[in-house]
């Protein structure tokens, strides 16, 4: 076993410690929180040793897979930070299509490997997001509206529990932890060392269509896509994005369709209803353009640039809401040129019964906004704008998605009522001493209690 690769805050030079503390934090709004040490694990034994060291030191352990984690959940005062960035594994069983992956494996890494084997995993849209946090939060992956949540494809997880046990968890053995791994988010009461994921056959032909409308035509674009999305092709994902395209002085609303098919003519037929029905007046459009997963990763990476500051929030809009009216301000008043807002179609997947799992919050309409900028002087502008638009939107929402949330700023419902209660009970059962850092709320006070899973805004009415 290799020596434990640990950097202690006490005794290390500032540059070395800071690189370990925040070098892999995506959001450049850097947290003012300081772990007592950072362990950069290279093998599974390092993870086991990290858990045992935290118990020996009577401190908490936080875990970093390497995603966007807008609030930098892994950086906690007084904790040992376990960074899994250098712990890598991808192994495919070609007979079953089940792949074993380490938490820091990104979607682009995994699909780059799987493509050579004729397989696909519908992971995160952004190429640089580690699967660990993505899957624990539920995983709103490619074509989620039709193929379901990525966490539903978790066959098993290997974990190190808060008391140092190494367990294999399936629906039949240690099933409580698999239940929690499908949607607990950063409150999962153990450290995942390995995910066992069911892959699907890769698609040979991907095509996209896009219809771009001026800011004044937001209502027209939104109402159109709402009218056709429910019955649309089952291998096509649908999204509406408000942004300032490169070189544009005005906000543009792009309705984007991405079809996954094995035949080019089938892809064209899938996209044809949008081509035939889209409203006139586009400022730019394309139909049935050849694309690929790598092309889509490139576009997603450009929209979510590294080296920037982010303020992000989201909501599941109620199915009976006037969606176009509820979202109008968030789509038509973007505060910076790099900010974007999106509506993501979740229907018809929301109409089918979910697995029995922690993930239990969804509606037909997912909304998220990403206020992006480079200068710290714009922190207040970004924060105040997001707070303002969310104040209007949250009253028409059922809850929020963990992956685009910051519990320090806004807390709402993240699970169904029964699932939320069960999850908090499991956290206390499997980690009674609160060794594994849980949900980072305001002041990091939640500890073993977790989140209340209620609309906090309703108490202010």
Language model features by range: what are they?
Residues 1-461:
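Soluble FAD-dependent oxygen oxidases
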